[in-house]
Amino acid sequence: MSTYQPEDTRKVTTHRLIEMKSRGEKISMLTAYDYSMAKLVDEAGMDVILVGDSASNVMAGNVTTLPITLDQMIYHGKSVVKAVKRALVVVDLPFGSYQGNSKEALCSAIRVMKETHADCIKLEGGEEVRESIVRILSAGIPIMGHLGLMPQSINKFGTYNVRAKEEAEAEKLLQDAHLLEELGCFALVLEKIPAELATRVASELSIPVIGIGAGGGVDGQVLVMHDMLGITEGFSPRFLRRYANLANEIDRALKHYIADVKSMDFPNKDEQY
């Protein structure tokens, strides 16, 4: 398995991502939610760190992303930003913080930027959130869009199945993708859509298109850290590649520690003052 060390250690910006697309360099993106893990992810050379509303699932144990609040997202965002020197930090606007009206959306985005010091925000949707996008961008806040499977709309769709397989939905996705670029979004996430459609979107847009379950024809890839490191169990979508099995490693370490405490093997004389 190959490893990577970035040659350019300068801070990644939204403009750098667009430059990376123009020269054909793929963009690496991963979630992080706390200081310690964000520091490791950043030092590894990740281009983008997403403080995702998936924290609702992997950090809080919720079934969906819907329960997480703006205050909670800001807490996680603050923790991550403190650790990061190079990567671009993106914070998700959670469900209910921008769908109501554009004023509410702007207030939410401003809070995220002021309180976390993140580089930009991400939100889900196309035409239906046009006014919110325009209002946020007018305040000088960069936006990463998100189309395809949109977890905040799980109650509307009912499943986490692949989206945009039918012609009508695929056409709407194409229209929304172009709209997001025209409005001024600097990048777009496509989740769980046919690879051929995702490749077409990436080829038609000048902004970076980052996929999760969208094939290899896009400009970059994003995964949830807990999934790719093998911390979460019982979740194996087709698009997920596990690069470690930390759940087993952690289990072994914990049981070893418990055994050493019970047997009085820990602490030994060298581990005392």
From Swiss-Prot:
Q: Which CDD domains match?
A: KPHMT-like (cd06557)
Q: What is its EC number?
A: 2.1.2.11
Q: Could you tell me the Gene Ontology terms of the biological process aspect for this record? A: pantothenate biosynthetic process
Family matches, as InterPro entries: Pantoate_hydroxy_MeTrfase, Pyrv/PenolPyrv_kinase-like_dom, Pyrv_kinase-like_dom_sf
Listed A to Z, the keywords are: Cytoplasm, Magnesium, Metal-binding, Pantothenate biosynthesis, Transferase
Residues bound to 3-methyl-2-oxobutanoate: 53-54, 92, 122
Annotated localization: Cytoplasm
The free-text note explaining how the cofactor binds reads: Binds 1 Mg(2+) ion per subunit.
Any Gene Ontology CC annotation: cytoplasm
Q: Where does Mg(2+) bind?
A: 53, 92, 124
* GO MF annotations in UniProt: 3-methyl-2-oxobutanoate hydroxymethyltransferase activity; magnesium ion binding
Q: Which reaction does it catalyse?
A: 3-methyl-2-oxobutanoate + (6R)-5,10-methylene-5,6,7,8-tetrahydrofolate + H2O = 2-dehydropantoate + (6S)-5,6,7,8-tetrahydrofolate
Kindly state the subunit structure of this protein: Homodecamer; pentamer of dimers.
Name assigned to this protein = 3-methyl-2-oxobutanoate hydroxymethyltransferase
Q: Kindly list the organism's lineage.
A: Bacteria, Pseudomonadati, Bacteroidota, Bacteroidia, Bacteroidales
Which gene is transcribed and translated to give this protein? panB
